[in-house]
Amino acid sequence: MLERIANIQKKLSKSIVERKINEVRKVAAVDVSYKEEKARAALVITTFPEGEVLKTKVIETTVSFPYIPTFFFLRETKPILIATKGETFDVLIVEGHGKAHPRGYGLASHIGVVLRKPTIGVAKRLLKNTPKDTYKKVGKVYVSVGNLITLEDATKIIRAILDESGYPKPLKLADKLSKGRIYEVKNTPSPNRSRKKRGNRGKDNNNSQGN
């Protein structure tokens, strides 16, 4: 069965389209966590590049397919599609690989093909036998094309929204929401904006620490 699915992945990889993306104003990120057969998917939609949270959404559903490396899309597609249904965004960041996959078709690519939306794959680790020309290391994550975006544009977008730990802020929020570590999101300035504001205060405030 898995061999047949692997062949389908190879065929579907040919449906991935790489192209320059137009103006990006809203970036969404989605992550899924599990407890037994329950999947909890969290979606976070933010402005770009400011990073202000516009909306959060958490859904729960059942899953029947087990976790099998390189076949992640069979397990996570359902909760992600439920979480993104009816939502609008310019780019979707998916916790999982896109073209950076042994068969060139990871979760982020499958979601992008199904939704017909620009998607970016982001993962903390590489899969074995991943072609080196399919990803870039940005901060602490590996970035790859999901669908309808170039690797150059995907890299620029992720670099612009990294937090101080080197992880994309919207995706980190989605991760925490999916795991129930937080239940609401409060807007905070991005690290770049915070540093700029501190620098401006230093010009007007004699008590500034000189940052």
Swiss-Prot record:
What GO terms in the biological process aspect are recorded for it? Answer: DNA repair
Q: Site annotation (Interaction with target DNA): which residues?
A: Y67
Query: Where is the region Disordered?
Result: 182-211
Positions annotated to bind Mg(2+): D31, E95
Q: Does the record's keyword annotation contain Protein biosynthesis?
A: no
Q: Does the keyword Ion transport apply?
A: no
- Assigned GO CC terms: cytoplasm
EC code(s) of this entry = 3.1.21.7
One Pfam family linked to the record:
Endonuclease_5
Q: Write down the required cofactor(s).
A: Mg(2+)
Record keywords, A-Z: Cytoplasm, DNA damage, DNA repair, Endonuclease, Hydrolase, Magnesium, Metal-binding, Nuclease
Q: Which transformation does this protein catalyse, written as a reaction? A: Endonucleolytic cleavage at apurinic or apyrimidinic sites to products with a 5'-phosphate
Q: What does this protein do?
A: DNA repair enzyme involved in the repair of deaminated bases. Selectively cleaves double-stranded DNA at the second phosphodiester bond 3' to a deoxyinosine leaving behind the intact lesion on the nicked DNA.
Which protein family is named in the record? Belongs to the endonuclease V family.
This chain's protein is named Endonuclease V
Taxonomic source organism = Pyrococcus horikoshii (strain ATCC 700860 / DSM 12428 / JCM 9974 / NBRC 100139 / OT-3)
